[in-house]
Every structure is written in C-alpha cells, then in structure tokens.
Amino acid sequence: MNNGFSTGEEDSRGHTDQTCCLIDDMERCRNQAGYASYSKRIQKTVAQKRLKLSSDPAAQHIYICDHHKERIQSVRTKRRRKDSEDDSNETDTDLHEFPDLYQLGVSTLRRYKRHFKVQTRQGMKRAQLADTIMKHFKTIPIKEKEIITFFVYMVKMGSNKLDQKNGLGNDTT
C-alpha cells in the first residue's frame, strides 16, 4: 500500500485487459487500468477535494489508470506544498506563533514547570501537562527588541556562556 493506493504487488492478477473504473466529468475513462485501486480512503479524498471523479457502478473492479492515480496524488500533495509555502512567506506581524510543546518529553515539561513554578495537579499526563504549560507560556511577556539587542551584543562580545561551557568559545584556529 503506497499513499492509500494498492501497488498491485499484493495482487498477482494482471490488469492488461481492464480499463480504468473511473468516470471523469461524466465520461468513462478508457485508459488501461494500472495496479492502483480506488479504495474508500481515496474516494473520500476525491470527495473532499471536489474532483469530478466517481467509480463506474458497471465496472467489475476498482483499479484506476496511472493518469488518475497521479492526478489524485498531486491534489493530495499540493495542499502540503501550499501550506509549506505559506509558512515561508509569513510576516513579522504574526505574533501568535508558538512552539509545539506537545513534541517535548515529560521530563522537559516537568523541568519547565519547576523553573517557572507553574501550579499543576499531580499525575498529569503529558498532553495535559503540555496544555497547562502552553497556557503559561502564552502569558509570558517578552520585549523582543531588548532580547535581540542583547543577543547581538553577546555574539559580538563573544561572551556566550553556553559556547564557553561547551568549549566553543576557546577557538584557537
């Protein structure tokens, strides 16, 4: 199974005598059927993307041609690409971008909780702890200009404690 499409490696029958089972914009496709199948998951994707594709009820199989397979896959991946392009063109006015704390481990979340003395009940699960910490994280006031100025100053002066601690500040080359 590849992206919801059956590759046919699980199925040893040949499809050389079959045509695509899809009706494209009210016209039955006449292309040779490949090994990709028109599963319920793919049907759901087609419906969500409002493609004018439907399965021919007269067809005795669910195999589709390579053209329709590629068309469905391109619609599925186009959304991901569009999202990633949108992310790269973000402006500085979007101040509501927060890190994904749900990816952090429980020990890291607990360390944050201890450091900022966040009040929580005992025995919280990771997702609940991340929710509580995210609420606290959003309330922390920051002075962006001051932070950036301090960062640039520290870099120029070469006095970053973390670099010196890791041996990076003692560069002799």
From Swiss-Prot:
Gene Ontology process terms (BP): regulation of DNA-templated transcription; regulation of G2/M transition of mitotic cell cycle
Disruption of the gene: reported phenotype: Does not cause cell morphology changes, cell growth defects, cell cycle phenotypes, or loss of Smr/SMRTER protein from the Sin3A-histone deacetylase (HDAC1/Rpd3) complex.
InterPro entries: His_deAcase_SAP30/SAP30L, SAP30_C_sf, SAP30_Sin3-bd, SAP30_zn-finger
Positions of region (Disordered): 73-94
Localization (cell): Nucleus
Keyword set includes Metal-binding: yes
Main location: nucleus
Matching Gene3D superfamilies: 3.40.1800.30, 6.10.160.20
Phosphothreonine, modified sites: 91, 93
Annotated zinc fingers (Atypical), start-end: 20-68
Entry GO terms, CC: histone deacetylase complex
Pfam families: SAP30_Sin3_bdg, zf-SAP30
GO MF annotation terms: DNA binding; transcription coregulator activity; zinc ion binding
Role noted for this protein: Component of the class 1 Sin3A-histone deacetylase (HDAC1/Rpd3) complex (HDAC). Appears to be a non-essential subunit of this complex which is not required for cell cycle regulation of progression through the G2 phase of the cell cycle.
Family under the similarity heading: Belongs to the SAP30 family.
Record's subunit section: Component of the class 1 Sin3A-histone deacetylase (HDAC1/Rpd3) complex (HDAC). Not essential for stability of the complex, recruitment of the complex to some promoters, or the deacetylase activity of the complex.
Entry protein name: Histone deacetylase complex subunit SAP30 homolog
Source species: Drosophila melanogaster
